[in-house]
Amino acid sequence: ELDQWETEAGQFVQAQYESALSMPDPQPADLLTHDFAPTPITEERGERAPKGAEPTVMVDAALFAIKELMAAHPEALLYGQDVGGRLGGVFREAATLAQKFGDERVFNTPIQEAFIIGSTVGMSATGLKPFVEVQFADYLWPGMNQLFTEVSRSYYLSNGKWPVSTVIRVPIGAYGSGGPFHSSSIETAVTSIRGIKIAYPSTGADLKGLMKSAFYDPNPVVIFEHKGLYWSKIPGTEGAKTPEPSEDYVIPFGKARTALEAEASTIAAGESAVVVTYGMGVYWAQKAAKAFPGQISILDLRTLAPWDRAAVMAEARTHGRVLVLTEECSSPSFAQSVQGAI
């Protein structure tokens, strides 16, 4: 019987090999096809600030988004290090979810980022929709091979058949006394990977809206969540706490928002400038802008892949002066690539 199986397997492989050889050569135009599957979220929908909604800290905005999605979609899972019922996440970002949805849908994993990220390929292929968490951005490196080789390329290599539908949450940035192992900003490394969408919101409303959009997007999405904005404890970051949007609120990727607008008179006089930034940079820019009243606009990118080129170029033309602000090292960086595009 084993010999028969071996013979049948050999015949199957040979037939597939001969079929592949008979295929026409790839065309150059095919090189850029199937990098992303079409998304159903193409415009902002729902209420961003419903009447009577209470101000919500950023970490809770994400928690409520996932809670709503898991209640509505039995295929949704959440797993990662310490997100299970005993702790509920080191930032309380998964609190109560295991108790509400059970250990089968919310569970801990080994301390192995390659497994956490790589497992989403199989989960997605079977029809599940995993939220996974890498506990700190500094810990993403062991999972980069899976992110680059498997997750980002599945849709392309399968000729548009198998996108990896997953949301990867990554707390990021310097906060508290994290030291060299809990403070890194690594968005440049991830933005260099084609086939992944990337969000980096600065407010609770944006985090919830982008979290919902990421879930309904068939492509892999990485969401960077700045630890220093989770509770708005850092002076000047109170703006990250926003009224909780409605359950159906979604934001399309690639659409920036204006966080501060210069006065028309200073723009007309040629005395204005725009700061293009994201995440914690929004609040650094707001603080600095107080020294230049009426002269500064702030454009919050909200998503880094894709980023809103049209809005950035329009602001550059309007003001003639652009400062791109990032927490990362300046060179090489994603911010530097934005500068280059301008």
Predicted regions: what is each one?
Residues E1-E18, S22, L32-F224, G228-Y230, ...:
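Thiamine diphosphate
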Residues D3, T7, Q11-Q14, A29, ...:
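Generic alpha-helical secondary structure signal
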Residues T7-P50:
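Terminal amphipathic helices with adjacent charged low-complexity linkers/tails
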Residues P26, F181-S184, S202, I251, ...:
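Short coil/turn linker and secondary-structure boundary residues
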Residues P28, F131, I198-A199, S297, ...:
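A local structural micro-motif
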